[in-house]
């Protein structure tokens, strides 16, 4: 988690130095970690501009001058005119009433997609009766800018809820091309205080909820021979985070879900990938430091996610970290 955050802070520094106020022009960043960096260690990034649109960089420990990150490459420039489009595509985004889900839904609609905005309207821990307002507000925002969208208020934690989300897409737009499993809740407790109710509530939304929506959507995609599915994992699942055994277990389980689903979808041109976002949202507002929240706008996760949802995406079964202007891939290896 700390290495991922360091990567994000460095990317932010590169953007401020080379393309201030224009983070959307960041095109590519690559590097190699040479030494372990511990929480609280100060860092300094050295940048050499090699040519227009390109720079090399390295990061050192500002206290000891030890090399932390080497072989850094940063490329930047204007966005290509042939932008990724989703004309005539139908997308479902769960948990889309605010934060990341809203950002996904709005940008998909801007680029031509017809969007089902699913949001139960409950609180961060999933409690409460829910309210239609969050989903309706996002739908209104999309329609006001000339896009097409419908709201859905079903709870993905139930099989019927998942079926109804997909049914909403079929009834409104006739099909499903894209599914972003984004809905989530938190019930943080240390293991000795983790009651079955809190364990199951988190599993039911994150893991079971993704299954409840993905299965009916996958059937439609397989029949038509096309689909893009996004799972959402977390550093808490890949590396652990105190007090989040339920959340971490659910989030890493989604990686296993992806690994098998990519095989089942291969013959039908269904790509399944996973995003590990760092973004300011109702789930992270009291988890991430205030300084990180200010630099972690949900919109900075959107480009990677939308690319994985597009026809251009050639990969399936990968995990991508996204946030704070930086993108990288996480891979599990043996040996």
What is each model feature region?
Residues 190-191, 195-200:
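Substrate-binding pocket helix/loop in short-chain dehydrogenase/reductase
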Residues 28, 33-40, 44-82:
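HotDog/MaoC-like acyl-thioester-processing domains
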Residues 274, 292-335:
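C-terminal helical subdomain
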Residues 83-116:
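Canonical Rossmann dinucleotide-binding motif of NAD(H)/NADP(H)-dependent dehydrogenases/reductases
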